């Protein structure tokens, strides 16, 4: 019986790079893993087939041998080290590298109540804060649903401690070696889920998993100075790992709501300060808000629109620093609207006074603008 081409099994071209091969294998492994397909008799065979293909194509040496000689490269110990004994790659390393900490996907046993072989999965919770809460720090109560230890069996998965016995398939090792022809791969025992234990009489409430979904409420302390996208880690507050398995962590991710006055950039805060055309021309002291109360800033005589005024120490102290940023005020000069006839006449009279050299001296940007235009035609 002819063997299927490894590239065909993974659904990749012969020029595929390692990332494409890994991505293709991960997709197939998640689709056909025996612990997710206990009702499909062909799933385990397809899973092993994909694993064999990946073990060859993910190794530069074995892939090179396979490209030259095909399946014959691994028969009778030829080329690439073969797969028998200790010469081949460790499947558990491959599997762990790809799936990392997602024990919740493959951890449950098919044999009636096996536990999980990896720590519980980490959880993510997004929390919205106002700018003031993010800058000053706060306490927030969050509610969510996640797997937690079963109350009925205290997370053991069994009615009684005596119901937990050594797995007879792997003899307590948690690993089995699967042989198919000249291929041999090591994987988590399908009967105990890699724990090395089996449960004779599973807990009727959690069905031997040791965990159940529960609604939880926690108070989270948000440190002062957090910014949008920062995460607060709560160790051990993630998904419960089940009997004898470490819990995952809970990561609370911060989302800062848009403020109607301030914009934050790192340690500094920015704001627009509207100034009338007369105050900008004559100069004035203007009162502005900050997160710590009101302060006054000096708008100098002749200030132009867009001028940045810095108020030191009125910004933010980011997390893990002691240096406080500044408040940057951008002057926005407001042009008056809905003028009366008398006001328009007064402005025209004022405009008439801006003549000759003094006109350019009193309008420096306009002088610079016309000079630049003149330079274009010189």
UniProtKB/Swiss-Prot annotation:
One of its GO terms (cellular component) is cytoplasm. GO terms for molecular function: ATP binding; heat shock protein binding; unfolded protein binding; zinc ion binding. It comes from the Bacteria. It is found in: Cytoplasm. Binds 2 Zn(2+) ions per monomer. It comes from Psychrobacter cryohalolentis (strain ATCC BAA-1226 / DSM 17306 / VKM B-2378 / K5). Participates actively in the response to hyperosmotic and heat shock by preventing the aggregation of stress-denatured proteins and by disaggregating proteins, also in an autonomous, DnaK-independent fashion. Unfolded proteins bind initially to DnaJ; upon interaction with the DnaJ-bound protein, DnaK hydrolyzes its bound ATP, resulting in the formation of a stable complex. GrpE releases ADP from DnaK; ATP binding to DnaK triggers the release of the substrate protein, thus completing the reaction cycle. Residues 5-70 form the J domain. GO terms for biological process: chaperone cofactor-dependent protein refolding; DNA replication; protein refolding; response to heat. PROSITE patterns: DNAJ_2, ZF_CR. SMART domains: DnaJ (SM00271). Homodimer. Belongs to the DnaJ family. Its cofactor is Zn(2+). Zn(2+) 1 binds at residues 150, 153, 203, 206. CXXCXGXG motif repeats lie at residues 150-157, 167-174, 189-196, 203-210. The keyword Chaperone applies. It holds the Pfam family DnaJ. Keywords: Chaperone, Cytoplasm, DNA replication, Metal-binding, Repeat, Stress response, Zinc, Zinc-finger. InterPro entries: DnaJ, DnaJ_C, DnaJ_domain, HSP40/DnaJ_pept-bd, HSP_DnaJ_Cys-rich_dom, HSP_DnaJ_Cys-rich_dom_sf, J_dom_sf. Zn(2+) 2 binds at residues 167, 170, 189, 192. This is Chaperone protein DnaJ. A zinc finger (CR-type) spans 137-215. The J domain is necessary and sufficient to stimulate DnaK ATPase activity. Zinc center 1 plays an important role in the autonomous, DnaK-independent chaperone activity of DnaJ. Zinc center 2 is essential for interaction with DnaK and for DnaJ activity.
């Amino acid at each position: 019986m002819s063997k299927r081409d490894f590239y065909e099994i993974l659904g990749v071209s012969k020029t595929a790079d390692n990332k494409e091969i890994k991505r293709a294998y991960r997709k197939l492994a998640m689709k056909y893993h025996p612990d997710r397909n206990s009702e499909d008799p062909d799933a385990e065979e397809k899973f092993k087939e994909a694993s064999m293909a990946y073990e060859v194509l993910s190794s530069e040496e074995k892939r090179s041998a396979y490209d030259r000689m095909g399946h014959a490269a691994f028969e009778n110990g030829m080329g690439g080290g073969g797969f028998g004994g200790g010469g081949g790659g460790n499947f558990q390393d491959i599997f762990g590298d790809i799936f990392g900490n997602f024990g919740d996907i493959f951890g449950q046993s098919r044999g009636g109540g096996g536990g999980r072989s990896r720590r519980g999965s980490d959880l993510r919770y997004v929390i919205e804060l106002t700018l003031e809460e993010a800058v000053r720090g706060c306490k927030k109560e969050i509610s969510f649903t996640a797997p937690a230890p079963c109350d009925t069996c205290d997370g053991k998965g069994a009615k009684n401690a005596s119901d937990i016995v050594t797995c007879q398939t792997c003899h307590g090792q948690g690993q089995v070696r699967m042989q198919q022809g000249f291929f041999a791969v090591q994987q988590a025992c399908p009967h105990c889920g890699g724990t090395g234990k089996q449960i004779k009489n599973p807990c009727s409430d959690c069905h031997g998993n040791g965990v159940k979904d529960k609604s939880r409420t926690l108070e989270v302390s948000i440190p002062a100075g957090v910014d949008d996208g920062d995460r607060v880690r709560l160790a051990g507050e993630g998904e419960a790992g089940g009997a004898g398995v470490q819990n995952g962590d809970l990561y609370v991710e911060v989302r800062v709501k848009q403020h109607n006055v301030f914009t934050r950039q790192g340690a500094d805060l920015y704001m627009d300060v509207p100034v009338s055309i007369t105050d900008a021309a004559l100069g004035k002291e203007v009162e502005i808000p900050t997160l710590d109360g009101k302060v006054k800033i000096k708008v100098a005589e002749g200030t132009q629109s867009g001028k940045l005024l810095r108020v030191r120490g009125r910004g933010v102290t980011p997390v893990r620093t002691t240096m406080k940023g500044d408040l940057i005020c951008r002057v926005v000069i407001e042009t008056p609207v809905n003028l009366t006839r008398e006001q328009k006449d007064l402005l025209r009279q004022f405009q008439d006074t801006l003549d000759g050299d003094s006109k350019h001296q009193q309008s420096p940007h306009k002088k610079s603008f016309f000079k630049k235009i003149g330079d274009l035609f010189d």
